[in-house]
Curated annotation (Swiss-Prot):
The modification Phosphoserine is found at S36, S37, S40. This is Spermatid nuclear transition protein 1. Keywords: Chromosome, Developmental protein, Differentiation, DNA-binding, Nucleosome core, Nucleus, Phosphoprotein, Spermatogenesis. GO terms for cellular component: male germ cell nucleus; nucleosome; nucleus. The lineage of its organism: Eukaryota, Metazoa, Chordata, Craniata, Vertebrata. Testis. GO terms for molecular function: DNA binding. It is found in: Nucleus; Chromosome. Its main location: nucleus. Residues 1-55 are annotated as: Disordered. It comes from Rattus norvegicus.
């Protein structure tokens, strides 16, 4: 009884917490990461270009 009860509560809790948390984390981090990656990519290219030209 205790095992089945534990599994049921664990599964319900995991599913409930996992679905919304994953969605929010994915959407927010994806947008932020995309913007930052684009900016950092441009900066990295400029830095490498300047560094190479300097050398």
């Amino acid at each position: 009884m205790s095992t089945s009860r534990k599994l049921k509560t664990h599964g319900m809790r995991r599913g409930k917490n996992r679905a919304p948390h994953k969605g929010v984390k994915r959407g927010g981090s994806k947008r932020k990461y995309r913007k930052s990656s684009l900016k950092s990519r441009k900066r990295g290219d400029d830095a490498s270009r300047n560094y190479r030209s300097h050398l």
